[in-house]
């Protein structure tokens, strides 16, 4: 692992561009520091190589930060789910790229905007569907929730599996 000081004010794509001189392999990984997952990195890389695209993003399910209520046309609540897993996938923050990806970046690039959208437009982005554990730690509340899980012994990201103590059906 090589740590590179890319400065706090550098956009995400610019940060990746700044590490180009350290990447000596045909493929390289980018991982966000705010995601916690039991994703099999070896399988993600195998999938990336099998797909043959410039980029691969781990696609994960996210939990809604809000309760979801469905209301019919008369104003009756027909369902209520507290912070359910959202349909579809989000960027899980584990990505694999071919060296060619550096050509899509400059020092002002925001990785999640133009560079990834361009890969999609060109048919060069794959999505690895991860159905296991994934959680983000963007807020103090997220930190508290993840630490509570750890204290209760639910640690799928380090190999221990079991039913989470209060996530209900969110994982």
In which residue ranges do the predicted regions lie?
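Catalytic-core segments of class I nucleotidyltransferases/pyrophosphorylases
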Residues: 27-29, 36, 41-49, 61-64, ...
